[in-house]
Amino acid sequence: MKDPRDVLKRPVITERSADLMTEKKYTFEVDVRANKTEVKDAVESIFGVKVDKVNIMNYKGKSKRVGRYTGMTSRRRKAIVKLTADSKEIEIFEA
């Protein structure tokens, strides 16, 4: 987990995450093996901002069925990153 681009997979754009952006909180889907320190370092190095706090949520895979075949969807890990008050905003979310 050395490369920051391996830690952050993609931003999560939902109505709830858009509301959190006003509080300088940004949501990313991250690698399932990444910890809070790796997420913080990745966001700081990629976007050039200062991170105050990182919250992480784990989602287990769901059981899905197609005909008589059953399978599982992939598990996911989501991180909500709060920036410091004096930090600049992340431009990727501005559209």
UniProtKB/Swiss-Prot annotation:
The keyword Ribosomal protein applies. GO terms for biological process: translation. GO terms for cellular component: cytosolic large ribosomal subunit. PROSITE patterns: RIBOSOMAL_L23. It holds the Pfam family Ribosomal_L23. It comes from the Bacteria. One of its GO terms (molecular function) is structural constituent of ribosome. The keyword Cell membrane does not apply. Gene3D superfamilies: 3.30.70.330. Signal peptide: none annotated. InterPro entries: Nucleotide-bd_a/b_plait_sf, Ribosomal_uL23-like, Ribosomal_uL23/eL15/eS24_sf, Ribosomal_uL23_CS. Keywords: Ribonucleoprotein, Ribosomal protein, RNA-binding, rRNA-binding. NCBIfam families: PRK05738.2-4 (NF004363). One of the early assembly proteins it binds 23S rRNA. One of the proteins that surrounds the polypeptide exit tunnel on the outside of the ribosome. Forms the main docking site for trigger factor binding to the ribosome. Belongs to the universal ribosomal protein uL23 family. Part of the 50S ribosomal subunit. Contacts protein L29, and trigger factor when it is bound to the ribosome. This is Large ribosomal subunit protein uL23. It comes from Bacillus subtilis (strain 168).
